[in-house]
Amino acid sequence: MIQGQIVTLIPATLADRQDVYEWCFHSDITKCHAGPPDYPNAPIAPPDEFFGEYGYQDYYFTGEKPTQGMGFLILHQGEAVGFVSYSCFHLQPGMAELDIWMRCEAHCGKGYGSDALLALGEWLRKTLNIRTLMMRPSIRNARANRTYQKVGFVQSDQSPDAFLLAEYVEALGDGDYGAAESALLIKTLSNNTAS
């Protein structure tokens, strides 16, 4: 369990997989990050792709490969309000890529996501010695980009290739939205705090 200021992160389990998928691709906020008409380069992923080779494999829900990645439910007052994860398998040492989405629109704009990102970043710094966090949202998702910047992420003008292991550049270098549509946001964690 990871405690934030207003949310608690608990490891997601295999029993949570379907809910996590539904929150991402079949909720009232899906339109903010995936599928036509606004995101034609990021179609709604079918479950086999979402849980596939470069997606949320079982270890994100079992915790058995924490150096590669792991997922957490975001709880507020005991209620699941979203999902946050980190992935390291494809990145240079000392780095983690974060991803986050809320369960529904009613849980957006309340600080839950910001608090979850700060808490997870601090945990990664202390637990896995992660020093650099990365996020790759769509450049068109203004609300998400503002949230990420509010918690310390900054737009990088480096190529994503500089952060990826060579064997993943071709498959993952363009991000979920394609090279022209994917932002590259970076946050460097200090020795004292992730915030």
Where are these regions (language model features)?
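Terminal substrate-recognition subdomain of acyl/acetyltransferases
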Residues: M1, A166-S195
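A short, well-structured alpha-helix characteristic of acyl/acetyltransferase catalytic modules
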Residues: M1-F50, N191-S195
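Acetyl-CoA-dependent GNAT
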Residues: P40-H107, T188-S190
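Active-site acidic-Proline motif in GNAT/NAT acetyltransferases
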Residues: C104-A106, K110, I139-R140
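Conserved acetyl-CoA-binding loop-helix of GNAT-fold acetyltransferases
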Residues: G109-W123, R146-K150
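Conserved GNAT acetyl-CoA-binding A-motif
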Residues: K126-R136
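Conserved beta-strand-loop-alpha-helix junction that forms the acyl-donor binding cleft
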Residues: M135-N145, D161-A166
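Conserved acetyl-CoA-binding loop of GNAT-fold acetyltransferases
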Residues: Q149-S159
